[in-house]
Amino acid sequence: MMLFAVISDIHGCATALERALDLCENTFHADCYLLLGDVLYHGPRNRIADGYDAGKTSQLLNSIRGRVIAVRGNCDAEVDQMMLQFPITADCNQIPFCGHRIFMTHGHLYDPSVLPLEKGDLFLSGHTHRVRNEVLENGVRCFNPGSLSLPKEPSYGTFAVLDEKSIRLINLDTAETVLEQPLWN
């Protein structure tokens, strides 16, 4: 069974990323990492996260580069691409998944209600630093895993793990599943 780790809004926080990678590798055994943008830089409106180290964050991500699919966030710049050994400049990416489609984007450009998505498709986004788990009228599930390093809601860092049956929201500090959502209900 394929397992995706879904991570957003790292903002260069090496300590949070190191913890997430440890959990993803050793507890959840992730096959692939879906990065939803805002990878290295915190941007002018965010505070600098505790543990901020863009160089170390790059090294950690480059160590799994063959298993990363990423999209650009509003704080990501072309110069960030020079630090990373996998593409991060696409505004969106689409992945076939269990007869449906995963549409991944950062969340500042695309409106899931106007995209050509169908019932059962999964719209993954970040950007708001707030967890979102909602099914639109057209049957598309919108999911935001929150922020790894600068969370707003909930107040702790989160990421998600996704397999063929469900998507689970994980508390970065405790490794506990705080939300589990079946995909096909």
Predicted regions span which residues?
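Conserved beta-sheet core of the metallophosphoesterase superfamily
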Residues: 86, 90, 98-103, 108-172, ...
